[in-house]
């Protein structure tokens, strides 16, 4: 049967979701299935690039998008002359060198509640509130799968369209 999914948040093109929460309506009959059977059924119906890690029962009317209390995004940036080998489609590549300490210091200015209108797609902010609360914004050096990256982790209650991408790119 066709089911309408509600995702906790959207991802920009080229961005991968890790721990994306999704809500969907289920019938009483489906609720009677044990969790393992329902999980196996859902896994069988999803494309190979989607992994379902667990199922959670929620109250009727729950929306993964509107009832979420926080969201977290991680952007990986590879810097230097060589393009990342294994993560070329999971990281931004910047040919220059990045001053991670300066980036981290600048990031602290964006923590807290601010009007982020300048950090979103202009048309998406028309007649809409643009104040958001960023609970943390950290810039760190990380190594994953043998490659070095600068990771930008942003946590907040909600984000405007392209807000996180613009913060990271600025």
Residue ranges and their predicted role:
Residues 1-170:
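Structured-RNA-binding interfaces characteristic of tRNA pseudouridine synthases
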């Amino acid at each position: 049967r066709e089911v309408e999914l509600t995702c906790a948040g959207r991802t920009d093109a080229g961005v991968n979701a890790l721990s994306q929460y999704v809500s969907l309506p289920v019938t009483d009959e489906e609720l009677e299935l044990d969790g393992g059977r329902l999980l196996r059924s859902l896994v069988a119906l999803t494309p190979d690039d989607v992994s379902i890690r667990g199922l959670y029962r929620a109250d009727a009317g729950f929306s993964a998008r509107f009832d979420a209390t926080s969201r977290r995004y991680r952007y990986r940036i590879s810097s230097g002359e060589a393009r990342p080998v294994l993560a070329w489609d999971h990281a931004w590549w910047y040919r220059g060198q990045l001053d991670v300490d300066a980036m981290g210091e600048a990031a602290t200015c964006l923590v807290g509640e601010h009007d982020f209108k300048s950090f979103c797609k202009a048309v998406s902010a028309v007649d809409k509130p643009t104040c958001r609360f960023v609970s943390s914004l950290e810039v760190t050096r990380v190594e994953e799968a043998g490659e070095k990256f600068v990771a930008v982790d942003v946590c907040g209650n909600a984000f405007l369209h392209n807000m996180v991408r613009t913060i990271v790119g600025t």
